[in-house]
Amino acid sequence: MSKKVTEEQNDGADGHREVLEKYDAESRFRVFTNKNITILISVIAVGFALYHLYTSALGAPATLKHRSIHVAIVLCLIFLLYPVKRSASRTKLPWYDVILALISLSTAGYILVDYIEIINRGGIPNNLDIIFGFILMVLVLEAARRMTGWALPILAVLFFFYALFGRAFSGIFKHRGYEWDMVINQLYVTTEGIYGTAIGVSATYIFLFILFGAVLGRSGMGQFFNDIALAIAGHTKGGPAKVAVLASGFLGSINGSAIANVVTTGTFTIPLMRRVGYKRNFSGAVEATASVGGQILPPVMGAAAFIMAEVLGIPYSTVALAAILPAGLYYLGVITQIHLRASKEGLEGMKRSEIPKVSDVMKEKGHLILPLLFLIYMLFFSGKTIIFAAFWTIVVTVLVAQVRKTTRMAVKDLLGALEDGARSALSVAIACAAVGIIVGVATLTGFGLKLANGIILIGGESLFLTLVFTMIACIVLGMGLPSIPTYIITSTMAAPALVQLGIQPFVAHMFVFYFGLFANLTPPVALAAFAAAGISGGD
């Protein structure tokens, strides 16, 4: 790669942390001055990753036990790593967060110790069930607030009160109301609440694929995506914008976060777009649009596809194959718009001397494609389970990275990848746990069906109008939320309306998933657009 482009990458990276911290709560973690605390947290995170590798290879404990362990360690790490508010010190660990971390572990400890009795009680909670259940719910809400902001916890609290005071509502949303102990029981000691399907997928598929992404990142795959996109499209008309589309699509499919994707690739691509003449607003818009689209691009699709497959009871390959055409059309539309804008404004590509050659990029890091090809084979053609595919893809990635010196990972790098994976999984896992409160209440009260009936009533049983109202509902429900909770909420609340009108469940779920993601681009929240504007200087 040319020296000039490399310098631009380094300059863009200087603002990386500042932009991430402004728009992504996940990046506001503590950096301790006390080395002993740092080592302790690293040990917990690495142990967490090793636990998931072990269970994926040799089998997990009983469902409730496995999910409770997953949630407890997630909560523990969040309270140790993330301060109670943005202005709090990030170099010291306050005593109250240590206590919260220990209490978090006790919520799983209780289930592990009393598991047989919990099963034998058959859904009739005792006092300890209620106490630990309430504690867990409060901890999940607070951890979700620290990681994702206020939107998801507030929505979860509203649903909790809806379960308690359903009699106070009128019309189709009225229900008989449920006692406190019944609601807590639904959320804690069953697999329909906090320990429901969402956290189950987080504790199995999602964690492993995030860990896979972390190992790829340590091997230099992110830089490879940027370089190969630059080599392929950098010299074409309006090239840097097309580079943004390709790089963001590649990376977004794996990392699952639109904001992180914007910042990771945008700090490199947006300055390049500005240099060839694209305006600030257009540069930011291209990066935001491309980054959001990565979550509908196979093979990983930001991990949401795995939840869809689990909820619908269909093979993952069915979801990924069905997503190829709409994802292709999405990116074709973006690239076409870029090309037309470049032609209109007379924007040329970069000079050949400023960009790397495809052959040079492939020679240096082309072998990193092999783990992705292996993953595609395992998911689509081998007939093996997703967990099996994810585990062995991680192993293959480590082995392939050792082939060349430029990507070789020492033991320190491997441990760093395990820690990176565990940390990166926190935001997804806690979002899934918080969404479990919403889904648990919706299941208990029948809220999803009630909302579906309301949408159909407003649409007058017209499929077109129902699609329009469902689209609006998905965009509203997805505002300010990560992609995975967005899909879970929209599939629970909005998809049933489409199914009642005769649309196949899979088609309905894909519809709500796509439009839920577009909340990242839709005012007034538009978090991906805000992050891109922070880099481009647009408005």
Task: Outline where the language-model segments fall.
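Membrane-interfacial loop-to-helix junctions in multi-pass transporters
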Residues: 127-131, 192-205, 231-245, 276-282, ...
